Amino acid sequence: MHPKVDALLSRFPRITLIPWETPIQYLPRISRELGVDVYVKRDDLTGLGIGGNKIRKLEFLLGDALSRGCDTVITIGAVHSNHAFVTALAAKKLGLGAVLILRGEEVLKGNYLLDKLMGIETRIYEADNSWELMKVAEEVAEELKGEGKKPYIIPPGGASPVGTLGYIRGVGELYTQVKKLGLRIDTVVDAVGSGGTYAGLLLGSAIVNAEWSVVGIDVSSATEKAKERVKNLVEKTKELLGINVKVQEPRIYDYGFGAYGKIVKEVAKLIKSVGTMEGLLLDPVYTGKAFYGLMDLAKKGDLGESVLFIHTGGLPGIFHYGEEMLELLV
């Protein structure tokens, strides 16, 4: 880890959920095709359940919940949410209760199937986006308090200042690995949904004085909202840490193809191509769109000569949308 990051984060309660450093993998065939060195930070291999980026945030979020004496976690997401499932699974692992506030069609596939297999309490509502359900989460929290419980609300994607600490710590790990391997990285690329991971990458990179730029790929086609959310998270996290560092302006590009969760032929073909060329599995909601954006920007010369992709996980998305993807590939 990075000593400056360790010192900054030492006063915040953290539960260890990731037992190892996630590896950095080189993609030789993709690199040859693009004429750019492409590396992947395998945060799909974080170890708990289906893995993924959210577990870095949960180390601090659940550490905070336990330090406050909370006994039940409430969080929000789409029916196929990776974040919602791993949050509930991690909570159960720690002996906590969990309630998931979900939106979308109730279909027993992907993460929703895992929710049911693990006996996780789910409540389905109608909403255009997960942030609209924060009020519902607060109402559920009041209901649980009436039952004598002490709930802890985690916002969509774990996008809060406390959650952002997880990716500041992740940058400390990444920076140390890159130096140890003797790599020069021009650009780090990340999928942007709720924005917490990207905010942590921006702030963490500023703290360690990294030489790379951090690019976000908007998977929801809500780029201006994403930029504002990221800026707000960065400022609030700086306040939490008590620091004042200059942070790169968000560089977020729209590759959402019109909407969050919209499955398109271009991304389905990309997922197949990357899988067969490199043995690397991407999902159609987050990492597939983000890697599509990476390849398009790299071809335009916008990412420099060496790029590192943060693989944020999301494998169940393949199974949730598998039939749609197969139809698009015919």
Swiss-Prot record:
The modification N6-(pyridoxal phosphate)lysine is found at K54. It holds the Pfam family PALP. Its cofactor is pyridoxal 5'-phosphate. Its EC number is 3.5.99.7. Keywords: Hydrolase, Pyridoxal phosphate. InterPro entries: ACCD_DCysDesulf (IPR027278), D-Cys_desShydrase (IPR005966), TrpB-like_PALP (IPR001926), TrpB-like_PALP_sf (IPR036052). One of its GO terms (molecular function) is 1-aminocyclopropane-1-carboxylate deaminase activity. It catalyses: 1-aminocyclopropane-1-carboxylate + H2O = 2-oxobutanoate + NH4(+). Belongs to the ACC deaminase/D-cysteine desulfhydrase family. This is Putative 1-aminocyclopropane-1-carboxylate deaminase. It comes from Pyrococcus abyssi (strain GE5 / Orsay).
